[in-house]
């Protein structure tokens, strides 16, 4: 009959009919047996620091090096030892560090690109207008200018202002670098250091003080990053950062409200949702 002929043809073409039917068996497992709330194991989520996923860095790379993406490479790759692509150990070896440094210097050089012709300072058409003033010899490099340069790069790389201690440390570094290497090199390599800060390479989930069961709630800033990276490949946007600053992520109700806002935003791309299932079920 027709069914027997189909089975024979599939077998002949090495597309075993019986084996393919077995693929559907998993769909017959009751949902409650797979995801039954009362059978949840105790939470085992110790504090951790892990490297950004290749996708997160790729998004940042394309934004930071827009127009010259070919000059800036992605130093991160998948670790086949781990089921989830962003669960690898936070290892950054020498080749990775070298690529990160090259990327940082390349981007900063583009931000401040210029030439000197007959003693005249000429900004490049690739330069960023807001950054070019920091290497223009016609404008005094005051402490206020240095603070502005550091703050702008922090916003560009980390989407936040530098903390007081960070600002003080980077201004001191810029003063030393300018004195030792000259204005252009000193400014550039100081700003490049922002790209190598731990927050630009790693994601932290350390939490606050643990409770009686050893569980520690993430800090608001950590929750903002966790939510962003759970749905997208981008660093937290203004909605998440504002929510963290204003205390909206301090309790479950506030977090739920922010999550609902993210899901309700039709313009927000959420590639991590599909990728989660692809990684969890090893379906690609």
Model-flagged regions — what are they?
Residues 1-284:
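Low-complexity, glycine/serine/threonine/alanine-rich intrinsically disordered linker
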